[in-house]
Regions:
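A short, N-terminal "cap"/entry segment at the start of jelly-roll beta-barrel domains
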Residues: 1-41
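Conserved short histidine dyad/triad with adjacent acidic residue
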Residues: 36-55, 89-92
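Short, conserved beta-strand element in jelly-roll/cupin
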Residues: 45, 54-70
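Short beta-strand His + acidic residue motifs that chelate non-heme Fe in jelly-roll/DSBH
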Residues: 52-53, 70-71, 88-89, 93-100
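Short acidic-glycine-tyrosine-enriched beta hairpin
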Residues: 74-91
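A short hydrophobic beta-strand segment most commonly corresponding to one strand
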Residues: 85-88, 101-109
Length: 109
C-alpha cells in the first residue's frame, strides 16, 4: 500500500455521516472517510449481526469494543475482542463475520 496525497488531518468520527447497512440479521452502521484511495471506517455491528455475504476484499480490522466472530470459507473461525486485529489480502481468503453481543471496529481497506 502506498500512502500518498494525504495531508495531515484529524478525524472526529462522531461528526462523520453514519450510513446503515443491513446484514442477513442485524445492522451495521458505517462512518467512512477516504484518504488517497484508502477507505477508512468506524463500523458498529448491532447484537445478532450476521453479514449478508462472503467478502473477498482485503482489510485490516481492529476490534475496539465487543466481540467479532469471523469464519473463513475453508471453515476456520476466529474471534476478535477489544485490542485484537486481523488482516487479510484482497481475493485471498473469503470471510464472513457475525457478533452475538455487538462490536465496534476500525477498518482500513
Amino acid at each position: 500500500m502506498q500512502m500518498s496525497d494525504i495531508s495531515f488531518g484529524v478525524t472526529d468520527w462522531s461528526k462523520v455521516e453514519r450510513t446503515e447497512h443491513k446484514g442477513e440479521t442485524g445492522m451495521a452502521y458505517w462512518r467512512t472517510q477516504t484518504f488517497g484511495g484508502i477507505r477508512v471506517r468506524m463500523v458498529e455491528y448491532t447484537p445478532g449481526y450476521l453479514a449478508d455475504h462472503w467478502c473477498s476484499k482485503g482489510h485490516i480490522i481492529l476490534c475496539l469494543e465487543g466481540e467479532l466472530h469471523t469464519e473463513l470459507a475453508d471453515g476456520r473461525k476466529f474471534i476478535l475482542t477489544a485490542g485484537l486485529s486481523y488482516q487479510v489480502a484482497d481475493n485471498a481468503e473469503p470471510h464472513r463475520s457475525r457478533t452475538r453481543v455487538g462490536a465496534k471496529l476500525f477498518i482500513v481497506d
